[in-house]
Structure formats: C-alpha cells, structure tokens
C-alpha cells in the first residue's frame, strides 16, 4: 500500500491564493455580466442634464464583502470638469480671463500666475480677495544693491536716480559725477535741440517711465498665443461667441469700500449638525390610567414554599394608643408593717451615726421610743408578726424573758 503524499508548502500556498482570489474573480465576472446587461439600458436612458453632469452606476463590494451598486457622477461626453463645472472640451478656459494677470491651461485646469515684478499671494486668492498679485518692492529686498544712489519702486518694477551733481549712465543703475547738459541755457533736463513748432519734449524721468511701460508691454505680448483670433472668444452656455476682448491691464489701487449690496436669495438648507448634549430631565408627568388586569388563568400555581428566615428588625414605630383596662385580679394576702419599720430603724441608726461624727456622742431624743397605737398596746410582740397565719408560731418560739424592743 502506497502512503498518501504529504501536503507540500506549495499546495497550501495555492489553496490560500485560491481563497483570496475567489471574491476578486467573482466581482470581475459579475462586473462583466453587469456591464453586458446594463450597458444597452444606460445608453438608452443616459440623458445629459442642463449642468452637463450625468450619473453612472457600477458594481462594487462593501467592507463586509457583500456585492452592491455604487454611483459616480461625471461630465457628459464632449465636456470636461473645470473650476466646479462641466465645459466643452474644445473651449479655452482662459478666454474669460479668470485670472488677475496671467492664465495657463494646465490640462484642463486653470493655472494663475503673476507678471514679473509681482508675487502670488495664495491666501488672498483662496479668500477671493483682490489683488492677489502683489507688487514686489525690489528696492527693499535688494538691500540697496540695485542702484548706485537712489532706488524708486514702481508697480511691477523700479528705476534708479542719482543725487545732485551726478548723471545716470545708460545701464540705468550707475551714477557718474558730472553735468549731463553742459551747454544748458536755462531749462532743466530738456533736449539739447531747440524745441520747434510741431515737436514735443520730455524729461528724463518721463522718458524712463515710458521705457519701463514699453518693456512691460513686450513681456505681456510674449505670453500671448500666436493665433490672435483666439483672443476674442468667450463661452456663453454651450455656444462659443466672438467678442472684442482685450488683455487686462495691471491692477489699479484698491478703491474705497462701496455701499453694501442687497441681500442675496436664501440658500438651501445645510446638512444636519451633530446632535447636541442631552438636556436636563424634565418634571415627572402625572400617572397614567391603570391598565387592564392581566389574565393569569394560564399560569400554574405551585405549592406554597417553606417560610423563610425572619428579616431584619424594622425601626421602632410610634407609641400606640392605651389599651382597654383588663379585668380586676384576685385579692392578695394581707400586708405587713415590718418593712416600713425596718426602713425607719435604718434611718434612726444613720442619724445616730451622723450625730456621733458631728458632736462626738449620740444625743438622746425625747421621741426615741415610738408610740404605739392603743389597739396594739396589749400586744408586746406586734412588730414581729408578718401575717395572722404565723403569729401563733412566732410567739411560741420567742423567749418570754427576752427584752421587749421594737427595733432590731
């Protein structure tokens, strides 16, 4: 008998790979089936909305591995998504001059840049604040290395000037000692030729400003497209019309704050916010009506169980009302004065001891012998009996010669 072959690591790896690729192959197969089934219907019912956005659906897997349907929005055929809207693919996105200075079509995205001499402020651009192309102060950033004497900053550029007694060289930076107009007859910084009729003159400062302006225009024209016909096009809905559009000039100084505009239309309601913290509990409501008694006929009642142990004693309650008097009891035996006489004898002895301690001897009291009632005078042993039953026995036992003393 040939033993079965041992499972190899390669076989286990293949089984593990088959388990992991199983859901993926199932998704691909269902995706092809879905596409084959839904594609004709999607083509028939795909309608491009006014905003040129269409919605497509496709099969996808949830995190639990369950197959579901996902939706995706895209621009209609022949349109591309730029700046939050769908525009025609052949439309020049820079035709409406969306940028403050320079605009570049970066694969369907608007890329705004600034002219030389300006810096781009991203934060102001994101807040839609203008101008966001800010002038660079070359005189402040150059640390007085641009000009030999005086540096004057201008919008997008700068120019140099010399102190009195110096002239500016052709490079526009260097200053040389000397007089620029040695044969000057009275007018300052004018042309050496005499001004004639039909001619005009300008100072060196005015000429330098015009030169700087021409230089800026050359830089702007170098950035324009070669086809001048494309400069005057702009988009209006789905139609591309032609107009006499011009390049925007350099931004002017910000004006004063205008009057507040009229309030805009009411916006759509936003998304519901997060639930707030729970409030304080309200007062307790009144008790509702009693419900119907439950039907306990189907419940089987067993025998009563044994009595449990006594519980802990409760608190003492209030004193109850006085009960009704009970029936009178049977009469007791006759009383005796023996106990009272014993108490009086103890008091007499205590008084005698107190007198002995205070006076040093006992004082004789005139009332030392207590008088007896007359009905007891004929009975010398009256104080010895307790009741009538034992009187005869006590008198017989006492010695007749003993002294008669009423106190023990």
Swiss-Prot record:
SUPFAM superfamilies named among the record's database cross-references: EGF/Laminin
Subcellular location: Secreted
Disulfide bond annotation, renumbered to this chain: 139-151, 147-160, 162-175
Domain of life from the UniProt record: Eukaryota
GO MF annotation list: calcium ion binding; collagen binding; protease binding
Low complexity: bias regions: 283-294
Compositional bias ranges of the Basic and acidic residues kind: 390-402
Gene3D superfamilies: Laminin
Record carries keyword Cell inner membrane: no
Sequence ranges of Pro residues compositional bias: 272-281, 325-334
Residues with attached carbohydrate: 143, 183, 387
Any one biological process term the GO annotation gives: positive regulation of protein processing
Keywords from the named record: Angiogenesis, Calcium, Collagen, Developmental protein, Disulfide bond, EGF-like domain, Glycoprotein, Proteoglycan, Repeat, Secreted, Signal
Domain EGF-like: 135-176
Residue ranges, annotated region (Disordered): 246-335, 361-408
Pfam families tied to this protein: Collagen (PF01391), FXa_inhibition (PF14670)
Signal sequence, renumbered to the chain: 1-35
Family: Belongs to the CCBE1 family.
Name of this protein: Collagen and calcium-binding EGF domain-containing protein 1
Gene: Ccbe1
């Amino acid at each position: 008998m040939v033993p079965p072959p041992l499972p190899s690591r390669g076989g286990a790896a293949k089984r593990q790979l088959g388990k992991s690729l199983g859901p993926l192959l199932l998704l691909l197969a269902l995706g092809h089936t879905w596409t084959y089934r839904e594609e004709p219907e999607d083509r028939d019912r795909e309608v491009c909305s006014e905003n040129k956005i269409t919605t497509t659906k496709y099969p996808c897997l949830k995190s639990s591995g369950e197959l579901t349907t996902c939706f995706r929005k895209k621009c209609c055929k022949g349109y591309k998504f730029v700046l939050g809207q769908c525009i025609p693919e052949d439309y020049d996105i820079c035709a409406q001059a969306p940028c403050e200075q320079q605009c570049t079509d970066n694969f369907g995205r608007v890329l705004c840049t600034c002219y030389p001499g300006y810096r781009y402020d991203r934060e102001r651009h994101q807040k839609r604040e203008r101008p966001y192309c800010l002038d660079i102060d070359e005189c402040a950033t150059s640390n007085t290395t641009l000009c030999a004497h005086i540096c004057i900053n201008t919008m997008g550029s700068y120019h140099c000037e010399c102190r009195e007694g110096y002239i500016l060289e052709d490079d526009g930076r260097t200053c040389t000692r000397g007089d620029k107009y040695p044969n000057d007859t009275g007018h300052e910084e004018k042309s050496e030729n005499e001004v004639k009729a039909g001619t005009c003159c300008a100072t060196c400062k005015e000429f330098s400003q015009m030169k700087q302006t021409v230089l800026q225009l050359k830089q702007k024209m170098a950035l324009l497209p070669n086809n001048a016909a494309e400069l005057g096009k702009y988009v209006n809905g789905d139609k591309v019309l032609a107009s006499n559009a011009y390049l925007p000039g350099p931004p002017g100084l910000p004006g004063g704050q205008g009057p507040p505009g009229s309030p805009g239309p009411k916006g759509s309601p936003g998304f519901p916010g997060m639930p707030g913290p729970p409030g304080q509990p309200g007062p307790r409501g009144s008790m509702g009506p009693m419900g119907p008694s439950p039907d306990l006929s189907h419940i089987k009642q067993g025998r009563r169980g044994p009595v449990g142990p006594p519980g802990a004693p409760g608190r003492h309650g209030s004193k109850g009302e006085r009960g009704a008097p009970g029936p009178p009891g049977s009469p007791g035996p006759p009383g005796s004065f023996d106990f009272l006489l014993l108490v009086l004898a103890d008091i007499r002895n205590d008084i005698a001891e107190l007198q002995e301690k205070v006076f040093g001897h006992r004082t004789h009291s005139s009332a030392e012998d207590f008088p007896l009632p007359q009905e007891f005078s004929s009975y010398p042993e009256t104080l010895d009996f307790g009741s009538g039953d034992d009187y005869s026995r006590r008198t017989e036992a006492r010695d007749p010669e003993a002294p008669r003393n009423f106190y023990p």
